[in-house]
Swiss-Prot record:
Single annotated GO MF: carnitine O-octanoyltransferase activity
GO-annotated cellular components: cytosol; endoplasmic reticulum; mitochondrial inner membrane; mitochondrion; peroxisomal matrix; peroxisome
Family indicated by similarity: Belongs to the carnitine/choline acetyltransferase family.
Entry function: Catalyzes the reversible transfer of acyl groups from carnitine to coenzyme A (CoA) and regulates the acyl-CoA/CoA ratio. Also plays a crucial role in the transport of fatty acids for beta-oxidation. Responsible for the synthesis of short- and branched-chain acylcarnitines. Active towards some branched-chain amino acid oxidation pathway (BCAAO) intermediates. Trans-2-enoyl-CoAs and 2-methylacyl-CoAs are poor substrates.
Protein's gene: CRAT
Residue(s) carrying N6-succinyllysine: 93, 261
Source organism, top-level taxon: Eukaryota
Organism: Homo sapiens (Human)
Subunit relationships: Monomer.
Identification of the protein by name: Carnitine O-acetyltransferase
Residues reported in the UniProt entry to bind (R)-carnitine: 452, 454, 465
Length: 626
């Protein structure tokens, strides 16, 4: 569930004039305090939108039944009104009525493994090195780049991002470094060490399943240079050549309850506990991966996507991870690189902004060779593996192997056009792509489905996401008409434009805090908190259908030619992520092999055809030039 963001225009901090007089530490707080609070939408408005969103995806009988339940729910003096008042009270008392609830329900209480089910991966452009020297040089430069970005976080001088002229909440940037998820028996927690009395000065480096603590600052507080980091990485590489080590990191890929039990067993031992604490506190992790088996160029991208998302299995690089760590950069000897991140801390856009910065940084030449001062040996993190822990590792390996075999992932570069074409037609590129997805899905399945697209709520203090529902009556009318020979081309163009505009309108409402999904979730959680019986509208078939997202999608734009990916959120669904570049579009599509009805490559094929057909339709009927 990643965050949609229209390309945020970054302007410098300057909308609150007295900043030049303030200490840096109060700058971020002043910006955050000036942001509006997330509103609770009017009850009737959300319920009307809910009923409207159900029309394309449920039968007329189901819809009529739900309409009755909605009318009862919102009756004067009824349960809906009481819950709405409770939510409004919560909004007055908290900084954001949703953020804590969302963190818990979407992430910390979610018991499936973070791998595939929750943590997104990112594939960066293949680098031009093909050997160990190149791998370590690039990793060193990347580390230096992240530390350079960290200066802006530490000094609170990150340029504020704007969306449609409105400043955005920058809090997520302050959660992604020196943080880690910690498993718990029913609910996990996230520990952030960046604001402690002694903030961490080390990163974690993993090679051949062996973890190292690498200090990246000198005693005077200055960061190590890329040359110095390179020397340290060489030391790490040379002292971890054994390949018979137990992949302790694979424990973090297991079901959260199983991992919580194994975690408690693991940290009973002081040596293990100290090693785990070092990983949790580190600023971020760098995984020096073994090269994946060679494959043909067209399969290469999808293989690397798997490597970034899950490591490729216990025989390859899955043991080279600590999946609870918020940020893990991955660099392999063959030039493939990317990252995987734990989702509780942030959505895609802040991660991608950091990546854009770091990738630009890695292209800078080293102007001066830095002096090679003697540096201490990086500390190897030891683990005492008891038979019980070994058994936990074996179980985690088996579970991960099943998950990896079940994942069907395809990365497609759509070369025919990028955001340039929809823009030339005065259409939103995001809405255009979403309508192509609706068309592709309809052509395969002959029906519309509940579709989730992430909308950023960062216009509000501590805002995370809400849902843009891409399946509408407008989109359904368009996709039905597209292959109907009785509908004229001119009518099809009008229906396409109308569907795109409707999606654009929904997006605008969602980022202003007026979508209904999080509001309904809030009402449901309020009912649980008030210990009242669950209202019928939440026990209804229509609600179950509406929340079963066969298409879970996200636009994550970047300046870098990269793509993000994640697994489907339902067993019979798809995960679709895309980065629209100027003249091409990067897509990732995922499904599960255990579902006979879904196939990622087939959806990719139909999506490509839908995009081309929509372009041909618009080109055959040029807009009248005003």
């Amino acid at each position: 569930m990643l965050a949609f963001a229209a390309r945020t225009v970054v302007k410098p901090l300057g909308f609150l004039k007295p900043f030049s007089l303030m200490k840096a530490s109060s700058r971020f707080k002043a910006h955050q305090d000036a942001l509006p609070r997330l509103p609770v939408p009017p009850l009737q408005q959300s319920l009307d939108h809910y009923l409207k969103a159900l029309q394309p995806i449920v039968s007329e009988e189901e819809w009529a039944h739900t309409k009755q339940l909605v009318d009862e729910f919102q009756a004067s003096g009824g349960v809906g009104e009481r819950l709405q008042k409770g939510l409004e009270r919560r909004a007055r008392k908290t900084e954001n009525w949703l953020s804590e609830w969302w963190l818990k329900t979407a992430y910390l209480q979610y018991r499936q493994p973070v791998v595939i089910y929750s943590s997104p991966g990112v594939m960066l452009p293949k680098q031009d090195f093909v050997d160990l020297q190149g791998q370590l040089r690039f990793a060193a430069k990347l580390i230096e780049g992240v530390l350079d970005f960290k200066v802006m976080i530490d000094n609170e001088t990150l340029p504020v991002e704007y969306l449609g002229g409105k400043p955005l909440c920058m809090n997520q940037y302050y959660q992604i470094l020196s943080s880690c998820r910690v498993p718990g028996p029913k609910q996990d927690t996230v520990s952030n060490f960046s604001k402690t009395k002694k903030p961490p000065t080390h990163i974690t480096v993993v090679h051949n399943y062996q973890f190292f603590e690498l200090d990246v600052y000198h005693s005077d507080g200055t960061p190590l240079t890329a040359d110095q980091i390179f020397v340290q990485l060489e030391k790490i590489w040379n002292s971890s050549l054994q390949t018979n080590k137990e992949p302790v990191g694979i424990l973090t890929s297991n079901h959260r309850n199983s991992w919580a039990k194994a975690y408690n067993t693991l940290i009973k031992d002081k040596v293990n506990r100290d090693s785990v604490r070092s990983i949790q506190k580190s600023i971020f992790t760098v995984c020096l991966d073994a090269t994946m088996p060679r494959v043909s160029e067209d399969v290469y991208r999808s293989h690397v996507a798997g490597q970034m998302l899950h490591g490729g299995g216990s025989r390859l690089n899955s043991g080279n991870r600590w999946f609870d760590k918020t940020l893990q950069f991955i660099v392999a000897e063959d030039g493939s690189c990317g990252l995987v991140y734990e989702h509780a801390a942030a959505e895609g856009p802040p991660i991608v902004t950091l990546l854009d910065y770091v990738i630009e940084y890695t292209k800078k030449p080293e102007l001066v060779r830095s002096p090679l001062v003697p540096l201490p040996m990086p500390k190897k993190l030891r683990f005492n593996i008891t038979p019980e822990i070994k058994s936990d590792i074996e179980k985690a390996k088996q579970n991960l192997s099943i998950m990896i075999q079940d994942l069907d992932i395809t990365v497609m570069v759509f070369h025919h056009f990028g955001k340039d074409f929809p823009k030339s037609e005065k259409l939103s590129p995001d809405a255009f792509i979403q309508m192509a997805l609706q068309l592709a899905y309809y052509r395969i399945y002959g029906q519309a489905c509940a579709t989730y697209e992430s909308a950023s709520l960062r216009m509000f203090h501590l805002g995370r996401t809400d849902t843009i529902r891409s399946a509408s009556m407008d989109s359904l009318t368009f996709v039905k008409a597209m292959d109907d020979s009785s509908v004229t081309e001119h009518q099809k163009v009008e229906l396409l434009r109308k569907a795109v505009q409707a999606h654009r309108g929904y997006t605008d409402r969602a980022i202003r805090g007026e979508a209904f999904d999080r509001h309904l979730l809030g009402l449901k959680l309020q009912a649980i908190e008030d210990l009242v019986s669950m209202p019928d509208i939440f026990m209804d078939t229509s609600y179950a259908i509406a929340m079963h997202f066969h298409l879970s999608t996200s636009q994550v734009p970047a300046k870098t030619d990269c793509v993000m990916f994640f697994g489907p959120v339902v067993p019979d669904g798809y995960g679709v992520c895309y980065n629209p570049m100027e003249a091409h579009i990067n897509f990732s599509l995922s499904a599960y092999n255990s579902c006979a009805e879904t196939n990622a490559a087939r959806l990719a094929h139909y999506l490509e055809k839908a995009l081309l057909d929509m372009r041909a339709l618009l080109q055959s009927h040029p807009r009248a030039k005003l």
